[in-house]
């Protein structure tokens, strides 16, 4: 079942997809979005960034103890042309280094 999160259909679809994945894994998934149907940035670029952030949050949550798992998302317009994305999730506390880079 598709839940409706915002007026922008493309962004709504991305969030709905990750909401369904979180539900399938019984991870609490909370969303607060205040965006118009048309945004001031390229939708494709925005959705690529959003998908990457949500994928990382889901992967990190799956690696933590069940009682700590959660994903909280806030997306809103700030000023006239800025969009702020805030994603909070639990993680196992291990910061991984790859080729000397975190």
Question: Model-predicted segments: where are they?
Answer:
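Conserved short strand/loop->alpha-helix "switch" segment adjacent to the catalytic nucleotide/phosphoryl-transfer site
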Residues: 3, 30-49
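Glycine-rich/acidic phosphate-handling loop/turn and adjacent ATP-lid/helix
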Residues: 82-102
């Amino acid at each position: 079942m598709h839940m409706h999160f915002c007026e922008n259909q493309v962004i709504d679809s991305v969030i709905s997809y990750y909401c369904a994945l979180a539900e399938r894994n019984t991870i609490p998934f909370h969303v607060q979005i205040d965006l118009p149907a048309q945004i001031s940035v390229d939708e494709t670029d925005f959705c690529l960034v959003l998908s990457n952030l949500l994928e990382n949050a889901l992967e990190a949550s799956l690696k933590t103890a069940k009682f700590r798992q959660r994903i909280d998302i806030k997306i809103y317009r700030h000023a006239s042309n800025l969009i702020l994305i805030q994603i909070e999730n639990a993680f196992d506390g291990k910061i991984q280094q790859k080729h000397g880079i975190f």
